[in-house]
Amino acid sequence: MKDIPTLRFRPNKSPARVMFGFPWIYSDDVILDRRTKKIPPGTFVKIQTNDKQDIGLIAFNSESKITGRIMDLDVNATIDTNWIVKKLESALALRKTLYDAPFYRLIHAEADGLPGVIIDRFGDAFVVQPNAAWADRMMPEITSALEQLFSPNIILKNASGRARSLEGLNDENIFIKGSSDAPLEVKMNDAIYMADISGGQKTGLFFDQRENHAFTAKLANGGSIIDVFSHVGGFSLAALSAGATSATAVDSSQPALDLAIKGADASGFSKSFSTYKGDAFEVMAQLFEEGERYQVVVCDPPAFAPSKPALERGLRAYEKAAKMASKLVKPGGYLVLCSCSHAADMQKFRKASLVGMGKAGRKGQIIHSGSAGIDHPVHPHLAESSYLKSIFLRLD
């Protein structure tokens, strides 16, 4: 292998956690000088202990707090299309075991061996989020690997991920192959969802909530459900497919609600499905004053605490959401609360939610806790890859 740059740990920084499996190296862990700062972002670099013992091969970016991402423990590895194909094959084998239909998260970043890379599959369409500099640089190789394995009709580079700005990357979405102006149909939990992969939120659909949708659907059988912060109707359409008598979706985005309506129509649920456009807190307050109550109330907001500085404000928002949602639950009904905030762990999120429920004068029992779907594996040394929390409560 040709000579590659070398990076070493600082004398006062232990490499132990990296040697035991932690996949990131921070800027204050290593010696950064004029030489290393000239290395282009996304370059593959050999990482060593301070006494020159090889650790592995990393993707280097001096412009990011995450200076290094472990690519391979073999310092002589060649990171190319074939290397990426092997990672995709391993990830695909797991998804084929889990799902009958080709709609899922194919690559979940470090947990699937492709640091900083998200790939969602919508049948013959693939949405790639290269959220690390190396992946952005190697999009041609990632594209080639997808072509070899899947021969897809559509490959979209989605550059909307917040992490890209932390890597010094742009936010330009590009169709690398094919195009799609119309929403794509996704069959999931016996319902049909509409995914706008080019103009919708994130990659177009939240596969991470699939199992939580299914569990909630059981609770709604024979009753009513309101899906607050609904996006394209994830919880509500699944509930209708499982026997809910009515479902209401609440969101501030009319395009998202339009997709939810199209999904309800395609699923045959149009007569039992309704929507409210507006601020979720205002809509919940209005519905409470109007005397509306539901067998199941779901509150699945965007990240109220996306970072540590936003944590306290975010927890207050989760408390408020739980308080208002609790008031809409019928006696003996169910409350489903979700958080996708990295900064708020389950303990903090649960505490804020229970305080809110208590302030609403409601009591109950936790019957289940959920996380991201099984196509979102968790890196065993990276708590950040486990971000989604869900609490299911039965209220008195």
At which residue positions do the language-model features occur?
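S-adenosyl-L-methionine
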Residues: 255-296
